[in-house]
Amino acid sequence: MLVFSFLFVVVSINLNALIFLCKKSWASYLFLYLYNFFFCEDEYKLTKNCVRVEAIAPFMMCLGSLGAILGKQRTANFLLLSYNVINNPVVLVYYVENFSRINFIKHTTKEKSVIWTNERQLNPWICN
C-alpha cells in the first residue's frame, strides 16, 4: 500500500510520470482507482472516473489531449481532455480505453453541480 501511495503522489505532481502511466492501461485504471479512493467523496464514487476539481489549481492552462502528446489521439488509454478557466474551476475529463463511452466528471461550483454525459455537451470546453 505504501508503494501505491508513493506512486499516487508522484503521478499527482509529475506530468511526465502521468504520461508514462498513460501508456499502460493497467496503470490508468490503478491511477483512477487511487484518485477515487483518496480524493473522491461518497457522491463522486458513483462514477468510475472522478476527481475533486477543488484540488486542481484554477490557473492551469489548457493541457490539451494527452493522447495527442503520445501521438494516439483516439486510442490512448488515458486522456486529459479539457479545462475551464472562464468560470475558474478547472474541469478534468478522463477517457479510459474500453469504456463504452466517455464518462464526464461531476464537478461542483458554488452555484450548482453539473454532470456532462456526452461529448456534444462538452464541446465548448475541449482543448484541441
Swiss-Prot record:
Record's subcellular location:
Membrane
Source organism of this protein record: Saccharomyces cerevisiae (strain ATCC 204508 / S288c)
Per the record, its GO cellular-component terms are: membrane
| Topology of this chain in the membrane | Multi-pass membrane protein
Q: What is this protein called?
A: Putative uncharacterized protein YML090W
Q: Which UniProt keywords apply?
A: Membrane, Transmembrane, Transmembrane helix
* Misc. comment: Partially overlaps YML089C.
Q: Which residues cross the membrane?
A: 1-21, 51-71, 76-96
